[in-house]
Amino acid sequence: MDRVVLMLSVLSLGVSSQPITDGQRLFSIAVSRVQHLHLLAQRLFSDFESSLQTEEQLKLNKIFPDFCNSDYIISPIDKHETQRSSVLKLLSISYRLVESWEFPSRSLSGGSAPRNQISPKLSELKMGIHLLIRANEDGAEIFPDSSALQLAPYGNYYQSLGADESLRRTYELLACFKKDMHKVETYLTVAKCRLSPEANCTL
């Protein structure tokens, strides 16, 4: 009986002959967390669009934010550059993106249980990425451009807005949040894949 239990325990770690390291385990947790946040962002954005009148949807679709506040953070411009980037670089960019949402995410909270998950989930993800950075650093300076970590909140974040501007701000925040969580999910997935030499990390 003990032998069967031992065999099941080994199989539960996966079919790979390679042991699962602490780094792989941390990456799996981080990827799972950002996937949850990305799905949550997609759901919130979809629910928000569904709540709009047709005229409001058309108006907001015309101003879809091509530029988000976090675009000040230098990141790979395409999938090829992403694949060429080092694990440490991808982790560093992911950390900056998550950190840039610490203040704006408060505006997304409230009103529903899913919305109230955003800030604590971001904090958990940020801590996990920080641990991964420390585990992968090799003496290089992780954040050479400290200004990137001090991004100002979205321009009208603290202002009292009229109904139309408030609607636009919410739309922009949700759209940019969805965009950035997709970026972080991509970067962490590629970085995690690098730990498995046999894996195909093609995007």
Swiss-Prot record:
One GO molecular-function entry: metal ion binding
Cysteine-cysteine disulfides: C68-C176, C193-C201
Signal peptide: 1-17
A biological-process GO annotation: animal organ development
Keywords: Disulfide bond, Hormone, Metal-binding, Pyrrolidone carboxylic acid, Secreted, Signal, Zinc
Function of the protein: Growth hormone plays an important role in growth control and is involved in the regulation of several anabolic processes. Implicated as an osmoregulatory substance important for seawater adaptation.
Protein name: Somatotropin
Species of the source: Pagrus major
